[in-house]
Curated annotation (Swiss-Prot):
This is Small ribosomal subunit protein uS3. It comes from Helicobacter pylori (strain J99 / ATCC 700824). Gene3D superfamilies: 3.30.300.20, Ribosomal protein S3, C-terminal domain. The keyword RNA-binding applies. Belongs to the universal ribosomal protein uS3 family.
């Protein structure tokens, strides 16, 4: 099951939160979903240069608040906030509502699955060899503190006549473990041979009661090793 479904959707309410946060009625739900989709498409298109990882939309009464999580927030805000005001005006024209926009920075861009997927897609569009692009992103993620990463590309790789799928994995990516914090990203590369899909899974540790715990399994391993050695002496 964990291998097939979206890992973010599988963990909603466990260790992941919704990116659209509002309470719908039967009458307003369709229009709100359509509006959220328009907002995300608009921001992805307008802020492509800033490395947008996630867009969170919150509604309360007649207020609409959008939080953009990006790798380069300074490019979105601009000098004296000029650029962010242009984005606000564009959104206001699109949905005919007042919108407040918050900008958050991605703490570790190399360990963000969405940014990693877009990075691979960009390299494929520049005709970089797909294996080189995948391995480069994987090495950067592991250096940034990721516990494991899996990258999969599908399509006419290297201009092959028949589409195929190839993937690489480093470290652990426990997709069946619900307490595991798995980040997931998807992007598409528009090449001269067609569209190549890129999927990235990044394992960042296990979420327990006290938050993400990285070292617990390593400590348990160190405790078990002396027991084995004692049995070996017997």
């Amino acid at each position: 099951m964990g291998q097939k479904v979206n890992p973010v959707g599988l963990r909603l309410g466990i260790n992941r939160n919704w990116t659209s946060r509002w309470f719908p009625s039967t009458r307003t739900a369709p229009s709100n979903i359509d509006e959220d989709n328009k907002i995300r498409k608009f921001l992805k298109k307008e802020l492509y240069y800033a490395g947008v990882s996630e867009i969170v939309i919150e509604r309360a009464a007649k207020k609409l608040r959008v939080t953009v999580v990006a790798a380069r927030p300074g490019l979105i805000i601009g000098k004296k906030g000029v650029d962010i005001e242009k984005v606000k005006e564009g959104l206001k024209t699109l949905i005919k509502k007042e919108v407040s926009i918050n900008i958050k920075e991605v703490k570790r861009p190399q360990a963000d699955a969405q940014l990693a997927a877009e990075n691979v897609a960009t390299q494929l569009e520049k005709r970089v060899a797909f294996r080189r692009a995948m391995k480069k992103v994987m090495q950067a993620a592991l250096k940034s503190g990721a516990k494991g990463i899996k990258v999969r590309v599908s399509g006419r790789l290297a201009g092959a006549e028949i589409a195929r799928t190839e993937w690489y994995m480093e470290g652990r990516v426990p997709l069946h473990t619900l307490r595991a914090k798995i980040d997931y990203g998807f992007a598409e590369a528009m090449t001269v041979y067609g569209i190549i899909g890129v999927k990235v899974w990044i394992f960042k540790g296990e979420v327990l009661q006290k938050g993400i715990q990285f070292e617990k399994k390593e400590e348990a391993k160190e405790e078990r090793e002396p027991r084995r050695s004692r049995r070996g002496r017997q």
